[in-house]
Amino acid sequence: MKFVDEAVVKVQAGDGGSGVVSFWREKFITKGGPDGGDGGDGGDVYIQADENLNTLIDYRFQRFYEAERGENGRGGNCTGKRGKDIVLRVPVGTRAVDIHTNEIVAEVAEHGKKVMVAKGGWHGLGNTRFKSSVNRAPRQRTLGTKGEIREIRLELLLLADVGMLGLPNAGKSTFIRAVSAAKPKVADYPFTTLIPSLGVVSVVPEKSFVVADIPGLIEGAADGAGLGIRFLKHLERCRVLLHMIDIMPIDQSDPVQNALTIIDELEQYSEKLASKPRWLVFNKVDLMPEEEANEKIQEILDALGWEDEYFKISAINRSGTKELCYKLADFMENLPREEEEVAEEDKVNFMWDDYHKDAMAGKDVVTEDDDDWDDWDDEEDDGHVVYVRD
């Protein structure tokens, strides 16, 4: 199945049902009191994570999703039925972004998690709600409010522990083939990797981690050059980044400048991503004598002012890869897991007294004009007579 990690859809929550003006009808009772029921709330729109999905391709073909409208109220104080919600099933790791504000509306990082992306409209009030001692035959009602409409961009972010960075042909895919069972395409031309791929590395039965390989970056990627920085989002949840550097590029470019290019593009994309733990991995050390390779690596380290972790490997020969994997496993075992930023959910009060109190006093009240059959007069109430049997 084609890998699709981004799709734009329009979602519309259901409108709230309107209240109704109605009066009690019964044999021998010509004109009864008000019995107009409230409308039903509109249905909401949710996204829900499903571990059985791994692509957003379905949302490329259907772009509009609408929840059900709430039913209008009815006589006999019958409340309208609530509109049915609609749930969009997405792969684990998907987030929804409002395309107009770039606000992250929802994010589902674990199976079964369900988050609302569009709120249904409030129900309207029937005329029973307006009954009072001075208004015994109310003809007022309120209409249901409109449901929320949003255009959202669904973005699938791969869930991996280790993310790989580097220019095209640096050896990222070769490394994943060497340390895992994944078999991404490998060739001697740029941009062999066109979509992200994942590999599971099992150091020992009790220790394993997931590595993500993304298409190579080039200078100007932040401005859209090459494949752009579209795939960098897949590294946002990684706990450590491996910056792969080819010490003997096939195009004879400067490894120092190549490394600076990646660092610059990373910083332009996201300060948060640039601040993640990052290790340098010098690849293809088998292409030159050991002493010469060590001198070249030290030269690069000095030019970058690098004082953190670095490793020397030959991915194609699997030289140094085992040691690197053990180091990664130990590092992540001791690294405190990041706490997810969970936005505090809006507290929605479904009691009508708060929201509808304002609506009843405002301009949204609709008055039905029909005075012909009203047997209630507007004179001052003389009180009620209570009969008591001795």
From Swiss-Prot:
Main localization (coarse): cytoplasm
UniProt keyword Nucleotide-binding present: yes
Cofactor dependency: Mg(2+)
GO cellular-component term (any): cytoplasm
Bias (Acidic residues): 367-382
Keywords: Cytoplasm, GTP-binding, Hydrolase, Magnesium, Metal-binding, Nucleotide-binding
Similarity remark: Belongs to the TRAFAC class OBG-HflX-like GTPase superfamily. OBG GTPase family.
PANTHER family, per the entry: DEVELOPMENTALLY REGULATED GTP-BINDING PROTEIN-RELATED, MITOCHONDRIAL RIBOSOME-ASSOCIATED GTPASE 2
Purpose: An essential GTPase which binds GTP, GDP and possibly (p)ppGpp with moderate affinity, with high nucleotide exchange rates and a fairly low GTP hydrolysis rate. Plays a role in control of the cell cycle, stress response, ribosome biogenesis and in those bacteria that undergo differentiation, in morphogenesis control.
Protein name listed in UniProt: GTPase Obg
